[in-house]
Amino acid sequence: MNEQYYDAVLHIKTVGEQKGFNKSMHYHRYEPTPYSGLDELLNQYEIRSSDRIVDFGCGKGRLNFYMHHKCGASAVGIEMNEEFYKEAMDNRDRYARKVRNSKDKIRFECCLAQEYEIDSRDNRFYFFNPFSVQVFMNVVNNILLSVEETGREVDIILYYLSEDYIFFLENQTAFELKKEVRLPGAYEKNGNERFLIYTLRL
């Protein structure tokens, strides 16, 4: 199923990559997770309607709409780029016109990832290599503080992952590797074409 087709099904516009580069070396270029990758993730990993996913560096919001459409899950998109944030909000309006009662379950915030205040309902955190490991460490520490305040099992989902992220999670946190999801046909050519899911158990 191609990218344009899925966008049409969801009544959103997310195809295309960022032109140019961010001013800070800590933040990487926007590129949406391929729909084929998200399909494979859900083939092997369960997202429930009771879950609330936070996508850091959400761009135009593809993951939010996809997870709501497929699983009924709530989703929060965090995006520092004002243009992408506006496009995500436009997508939300378009999606809401076709999918009733979805606005309460999909939201976006325009802020730096480390400034997002983790909500006690947030339990799935998604990263498509959006920023440097220094920013990632700050975000993970915010997640851990939230779990200390409101105990719950949380998962971190990494796509096209950075070795620095893995090293930090495995050596400096209590997160444990729960699952690896390789993208058939793509992983064989590029070892980064996979998801790693880390969990923090109660």
Locations of regions flagged by a protein language model:
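S-adenosyl-L-methionine
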Residues: 1-49, 87-120
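Conserved class I S-adenosyl-L-methionine
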Residues: 50-59
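Glycine-rich SAM-binding Motif I of class I
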Residues: 61-65
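Conserved SAM-binding motif I beta-strand of class I
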Residues: 74-79
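Conserved short alpha-helix immediately C-terminal to the canonical SAM/SAH-binding motif I
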Residues: 83-84
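A short SAM/SAH-binding and catalytic strip from SAM-dependent methyltransferases
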Residues: 122-135
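C-terminal substrate-binding/active-site "lid" region of AdoMet-derived donor-dependent transferases
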Residues: 135-194
